[in-house]
């Protein structure tokens, strides 16, 4: 992050680091099978892309495309051929970068709502109804006017989920359900 609050340098360094790892992995690709290549990429490349990605959550489309190109390069290494479409990413069981980052925001929002270990000063503000309504049984988060904040991003994404998913207090089940929802959104977007 620069003094102008832009993430260009961070993404540039991240891209350089990931492409360096992929260059090193290409030297051993003839000695590895598909599953090992996939595991190596998930551990050495995708983990770098995922690390603290919710901190710089809404980023410009240009930077998001750079991150997506890194993921395409990683998928190309795994498949052993050129990859530039979302369908190939989904075949690997991965989410594209936009949805992957949204999934991490949703998981953090779930922890903020349901986890007792979440710091009290970082709690997400929920909508409280003055009267008892049928819609008050589902959880909705308050969306602040200030965008580019965790509260705003998490609330916008969390409120768009179906009510049965929002009310799920089991983290593992919530993660699986949101993963399926986001994969379905990717498939619909690709068509």
Predicted features along the sequence, with ranges:
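Hydrophobic/basic alpha-helical segments
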Residues: 1-191
